[in-house]
């Protein structure tokens, strides 16, 4: 990855100095795109759980937009991409229909999108370390909660979010290009009282 003064970097919170989260640069678009395609093609039961289809979800436009807005992050293991996610420092209007534990303004919340772990790193605790660094970043930006959604069919992700402290808050039946009409489940991690090594 290219170096830049805009590169936000956090050392891994579990003491692994070679693990870090970094902001994706515009020049890294092709690398990120290919990594998402690799994840879709090589993740077991992708068609059953996350049901991602590249070009429908995620899309080139989606990834480029996150990068352009400086919302796309990589979790690196040395020079290797271990995981990827988009972090928006606000929530979208579709989140307004859910009864959350706190009545927060859109810009008091961070939302996670297209979070994924590279095939060679799945099942190795990368998600836990990455979420710890996301919490540090989000708290540094003054947010009070992290919110996200997952397909009802994505049982591995839902189990993971529960283990990481996210609370189930409700569901909506929505249309997506890759799934058609389906249930989306919404999760929240209130940040009050959560301490990290960077806070």
Residues covered by each model-derived region:
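A short beta-loop-alpha structural element at the N-terminal edge
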Residues: 19-35
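Conserved GNAT-fold acetyl-CoA-binding loop/helix
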Residues: 41-62
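Conserved acyl-donor/pantetheine-binding loop and adjacent beta-alpha core of acyl/acetyltransferases
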Residues: 85-114, 122, 175-178
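Hydrophobic adenine-recognition pocket in adenosine-nucleotide-binding enzymes
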Residues: 115-117, 150
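Conserved acetyl-CoA-binding loop-helix of GNAT-fold acetyltransferases
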Residues: 117, 123-136, 159-163
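C-terminal "cap" of GNAT-fold acetyltransferases
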Residues: 151-154, 162-164, 174-199
């Amino acid at each position: 990855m290219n170096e830049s003064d805009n590169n936000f970097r956090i050392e891994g919170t579990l003491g692994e100095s070679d693990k870090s989260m970094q902001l994706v640069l515009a020049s890294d678009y092709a690398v990120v795109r290919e990594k998402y395609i690799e994840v879709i093609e090589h993740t077991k039961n992708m068609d059953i759980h996350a049901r991602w289809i590249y070009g429908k979800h995620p899309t080139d436009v989606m990834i480029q937009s996150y990068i352009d807005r400086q919302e796309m992050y990589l979790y690196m293991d040395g020079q290797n991409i271990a995981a990827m996610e988009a972090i928006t420092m606000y929530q979208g209007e579709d989140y307004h229909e859910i009864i959350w534990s706190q009545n927060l303004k859109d810009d008091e919340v961070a939302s996670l999108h297209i979070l994924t772990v590279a095939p060679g790193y799945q099942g190795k605790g990368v998600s836990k370390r990455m979420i710890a660094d996301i919490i540090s970043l989000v708290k540094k930006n003054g947010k009070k909660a992290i919110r996200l959604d997952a397909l009802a069919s994505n049982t591995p992700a839902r189990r993971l979010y529960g283990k990481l402290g996210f609370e189930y808050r409700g569901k909506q039946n929505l249309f997506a290009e890759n799934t058609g009409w389906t249930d989306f489940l919404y999760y929240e991690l209130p940040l009050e009282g959560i301490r990290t090594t960077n806070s």
